[in-house]
Every structure is written in C-alpha cells, then in structure tokens.
Design a protein with these regions (language model features):
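Hydrophobic, well-ordered secondary-structure segments
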Residues: 13, 30, 79-88, 111, ...
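N-terminal helical cap/lid subdomain that shapes the substrate entry/recognition surface
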Residues: 2-98, 105-106, 119, 131
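Asp-based, Mg2+/Mn2+-dependent phosphohydrolase catalytic module
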Residues: 1-6, 104, 118, 122-222
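Small/polar loops that bind or transfer phosphate-bearing groups
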Residues: 11, 19, 48, 112-113, ...
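Basic, gly/Ser/Thr/Pro-rich low-complexity segments located predominantly at protein N termini
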Residues: 40, 54-56, 100, 176, ...
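Conserved SAM-binding loop
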Residues: 16, 92, 110-113, 169-170, ...
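Short amphipathic alpha-helical patches
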Residues: 50-58, 67-71, 79, 83, ...
Length: 222
C-alpha cells in the first residue's frame, strides 16, 4: 500500500532534536554577561520557535526594547556561544532515527525546515542524522521571512517536487502548525516536544501524535 504522504517536512528543535538545554545555556550565558536575569531551562520552551532574533528579543529585559545596538550585541554574543556549544547536550529524541529510516525505506522523501539559523541547523543535521536521511535541509536565511510565513515552505516544496496534497509538515509548536497550513499542507504536531498537546490542538493541528511509531504509522497510512 502506498504511503499516505509522499513527502514529509520536519521542524528541527523540539521535533527531531532536543536542543533545549544548549539554547537555554547560550541564552543564560548572554544574560549573565550583561547582569540580566536568567531563566530556568523549561522557561525557554516558550522563548524558542521563531528563530534566534526572536529568542534574543524574548530573553532581553524589557528596558532594552527598541535598543538596536544592545540587541545586535546580545545577538552576536548568543550566536558565538551557541556556535561553540550547540552540541553539548543536544541529542535526537529516542526512536527518531529508527522512524526516519522506516520512512525512507518506504520511499517517503524527507526534509527539514527550521527557523534556526542555517549555519547552525545544517551542521547539527549532518552530525546527528548524516547526509543521506534528508533530501533537503533549509534553515533561516535572509532570502525568506521566517516560519510560519509561506514563502520558505513553498521554496522547499518546489525543490523537492512535492505535491501539497501528499506533503505533511511536522512540528512541536503553534508556529509549526501554522507553517503547514499557510502553505496549504496538513500539519502534524508531536507532543514530545517543547510545547505539548494542548498548544498543538489549540493551533488546529490536523493530527497530534505521542510517539515516533504513531507518526510513522500516520505517514505510511497504516
């Protein structure tokens, strides 16, 4: 039986890789350097998801809102620290590699679309998943507005030769559900990520799954 979806586009952070501790460490390192308040790791679950620029904006104190010079300094510091420490605690979620291999064996084409800077996303995919599992990896670049805006998703689909009716976007946040819908795709939410089932259902996810096995069965039409 043919798979229900021929192409699947995955979010990165909170979906296939647990990057939260390293993102939090980079954020708190930047905060500490300026004497700003720091945050518990779990608080970063709601700061990430819209790219590094938004993340920095969210951990900076409100008194610096609109201070472009301070923002650029904090962004540069965050990027430098994260670039050196992005693999300290990061790891694929259990069962993810097996799921990806099961999908590839069934002929499903896989891609990654993330708001993480491309210069960080591409090496992480290479390290943890190799070069053969994903046909395309697209991180944040200046040529496109970030997710959930449609242009970058449409670009990925064009590169893949994907049909919207048989393409699924998979992620862990409301941003990801909107990313799929804004490009005319079905969206699946994974409850093991940074945000959880309630946010995914509230955002209008077409599907919400709790395990990698459930996700594979959904994609394969089993």
């Amino acid at each position: 039986m043919a798979a229900a979806f021929s192409h699947v586009i995955f979010d990165l952070d909170g979906t296939i890789l647990n990057t939260l501790e390293d993102l939090a460490a980079a954020g708190n390192h930047t905060c500490e350097a300026h004497g700003w308040p720091t945050f518990a790791v779990d608080e970063y679950r709601y700061k990430v998801g819209n790219g590094m620029l938004k993340l920095v904006e969210r951990f900076m104190p409100a008194e610096y809102a609109g201070d472009g010079r301070m923002f650029e300094q904090a962004l540069a510091e965050f990027r430098a620290y994260y670039g050196e420490h992005k693999e300290d605690h990061t790891a694929p979620y259990a069962g993810t590699i097996e799921m990806l291999d099961r999908l590839r064996a069934a002929g499903v084409q896989l891609a990654v679309l993330t708001n993480k800077d491309h210069v960080s996303a591409a090496p992480l995919i290479e390290k943890y998943f190799g070069s053969e599992r994903f046909a395309l990896v697209q991180g944040r670049v200046d040529a496109f507005p970030p997710k959930p805006e449609a242009p970058v998703t449409l670009h990925v689909m064009e590169e893949l030769g994907a049909d919207p009716s048989t393409t699924l976007y998979v992620g862990d946040s409301n941003v990801d559900i909107l990313t799929g819908h804004n490009a005319g795709l079905k969206s699946a939410g994974v409850s093991w990520g940074f945000r959880g089932r309630a946010e995914l259902e509230s955002a209008g996810a077409d599907y919400v799954v709790d395990t990698q096995g459930e996700l594979a069965a959904l994609i394969l039409g089993e």
